[in-house]
Amino acid sequence: MAGLVDLKNEEEVKEYLDNLGTEYSYQCLKEKQPDGCNRLAEYLENIKKNFESAAQILKINCDQNEHSESCYKLGAYYVTGKGGLPVDLKAAYGCFLKSCNKGGKKSIDSCHNVGLLSHDGRVNDDKPDALKARDYYNKACDGNFAASCFNLSAIYLQGAPGIPKDMNMALHFSEKACSLGHMWGCANASRMYKLGDGVAKNDEKAESLKNKARDLHRMQQERTQQISFGE
């Protein structure tokens, strides 16, 4: 069919990819399109493997345009020192914060990362900020990010500066994490129901949640084995 690239034709594929790069460069550098700049950064990273150039485009697109996906990716670069950037958790935090507040495909992931970095304390002179962590975990959990829901349950299970221990909230977020496929959310909720730990004891719910945790663990092991076999 006309217009389709013959993937078996190496020259045709190369020409197609080169044309993509030209198109994205024009969108970004000439037309100043934020989405075009994000596409150019992805092209440089995934096709050209030019991480240094990708980092520079991401930086421009995040700093000047506050493009949510570019800010998320730039934050990830700062976390690992990719693309010639320094490892800089404070810079990463700023990028994730922009992405979280802006909204977009990666905003929920970014909100979770803001929560993690606030909880960890390394972006605040080794002073964990449990209140800020809770607020951003809440945003991510509202977007059905399972790990944020689980981290909220852990905060309420133990209590933290400014956040009193609350077993009902701990159970609520454990069960939500479980419903989103988080094995340890299921395990913690099961334990709370089994022991009656701050909530009404319920052996039936405890058993059901324990079985779900086992199922999730088995599925996780199967996925790991499949990845290993596929290497």
Curated annotation (Swiss-Prot):
GO terms for cellular component: mitochondrial intermembrane space. Sel1-like repeats lie at residues 34-66, 68-104, 108-145, 146-182, 183-218. Keywords: Mitochondrion, Repeat. InterPro entries: HcpB-like, Sel1-like, TPR-like_helical_dom_sf. It is found in: Mitochondrion intermembrane space. May be required for assembly of mitochondrial respiratory chain complexes. Belongs to the hcp beta-lactamase family. This is Cytochrome c oxidase assembly factor 7. The lineage of its organism: Eukaryota, Metazoa, Chordata, Craniata, Vertebrata.
